[in-house]
């Protein structure tokens, strides 16, 4: 009996209906395809890379359910897919756009995850392949452009089939994939991601040939799944309850968002639907859909670009950065609206009344629906707030949201404070202030809803720092706008000193010196105020941003953030890192707290470390962190160099007029004696004609540092001394 039972399954192919369905079509004359730059990239880069991978062999051909003795495979997997089919479709120009091809890849991986157990070797192999797939897709050209000639070329090339071996086919079946429907089940995926590194490959590869028949061989992955596969329907129901964990199963990227997924095609049975959600979250990182969205909207955006205000243009650049591949590892869950139905998050819309995502923000930005920067910031913060509200604080998607919000807040805080045009001056202040209010409101919501007190405290401190930065910017603006006035005068005075030797110009020089001293007397009060304002600015936690904004404002505000963006991404050389280390050691103790804050806010791995005992390894820090530190340290050291001047100025201002006059008299008397001695030897007649003019060289030399009151004393002193020397 037992033997008969064994034989029965082997004969299954011939008996009931478990015959392999026809493989997916690879060409369709009625459905015209085309060749685009993105499809060419998929064929020449993505498929070629994956095909050569050591884990690719199970996916070379459609799953042969009869050979592998998987009677229920086609009951569970409604849309089989494999890499060999995708390759042939690309060669035959079957696809109209790259998104269709990517959908087939997603289907293939999804089928594997649906049919097999999360711990099976084949699942780990699929995850490793999917990771590479997503990395390659992220580098695909952003705009899809049709290429004219290559259409006929594809049909002649079908050597791909020859490359596959019988053993390969068998295993392929096990991992074969179903149509593009992502799923939410498979919570264990999270733990799987690390496992990807494990290489069951050699074992499987070695036994490939034996895989089909004996379940005991290394290929048990396929065989094992078979058993669980039959009873999976009940487990599926159980998994449904774990609605939020669906996101936690992102095979390739360590990102999970219960709430972010593209709506998948309708599903026929609950099991498939469930897996779909999971797969979707795994597929979310794929950038192409995002690019498609951008491509479709670019023309409209480009046409209206000029109408965006200075601030909204900056906001648009922030949005573009958040959508860039630089942040894709943790931003992908927020690319599209949450598909609660596909992810089986039945209570999502009961809890979240105002869903928000980056594609919606982009659509509103392109449609000019934001009146100002604060409207844009409110939507972005609403998106993060929703995430904190719905997911538990220790959920991975919350950690991803925090990372992305750090990027957003840091860039938003650097918004140019004031546009170049004078009329627009008041505008920047308003958005910045309202931004603070907005962030405080969103932080309050998220704290009450999600209960993640740590993130709220961080946000509150960041808010306080941003407000202090704002004050510092305004104060330094006022201070620095006055400071440059003195520079041209010093240059003039130097020139005058060189000309003092000429008798004819002496009289003119004397008048100029007096005129300048009078001007200085007028400029002195604002200069004092500027110095006083500098003091509170130093107390502010962060002056780095302020200093940078002021410098850039002097050039072109409109282009400032572009150059800054490029600069931030530049990696540091060894010499630059060494110099930065030396500069940090030169900072006073009170400035080091800000250095630690910059590092902790930008480096998640150091966020929980003790600020008093933090160790900085410059090799492990990101280029953006190093550049931010460099800017901050430079601004601190520049201020340090300026301090002696302002300090001496304050001391002089504090002295009484009488003391100043007396000191100047003494200095002038000494210098005038020397000067008069030198002049008497070379230019006696001139001194006789104008006794008061000769000594003017002395006072003029000091005029740059003396206050206006010393002008009169110097002139009177010079006349009396010159008469004595005669």
Curated annotation (Swiss-Prot):
GO biological process: one example: regulation of transcription by RNA polymerase II
Name of this protein: Bromodomain-containing protein 3
PROSITE patterns linked: BROMODOMAIN_1, BROMODOMAIN_2, NET
SUPFAM superfamilies in alphabetical order: Bromodomain
Ranges of Pro residues composition bias in the record: 15-26
Modified residues (N-acetylserine): 2
The NET domain, residue ranges: 562-644
Coiled-coil blocks: 453-524, 645-684
Similarity-based family: Belongs to the BET family.
CDD domains per UniProt: Bromo_Brdt_I_like (cd05497), Bromo_Brdt_II_like (cd05498)
Activity regulation (UniProt): Inhibited by JQ1, a thieno-triazolo-1,4-diazepine derivative, which specifically inhibits members of the BET family (BRD2, BRD3 and BRD4). The first bromo domain is inhibited by GSK778 (iBET-BD1), which specifically inhibits the first bromo domain of members of the BET family (BRD2, BRD3 and BRD4). The second bromo domain is inhibited by ABBV-744, which specifically inhibits the second bromo domain of members of the BET family (BRD2, BRD3 and BRD4).
Recorded name of the encoding gene: BRD3
InterPro entries according to UniProt: Bromo_Brdt_I, Bromo_Brdt_II, Bromo_chromatin_reader, Bromodomain, Bromodomain-like_sf, Bromodomain_CS, NET_dom, NET_sf
Organism field: Homo sapiens
Gene Ontology CC, one term: chromatin
Expression sites by tissue: Ubiquitous.
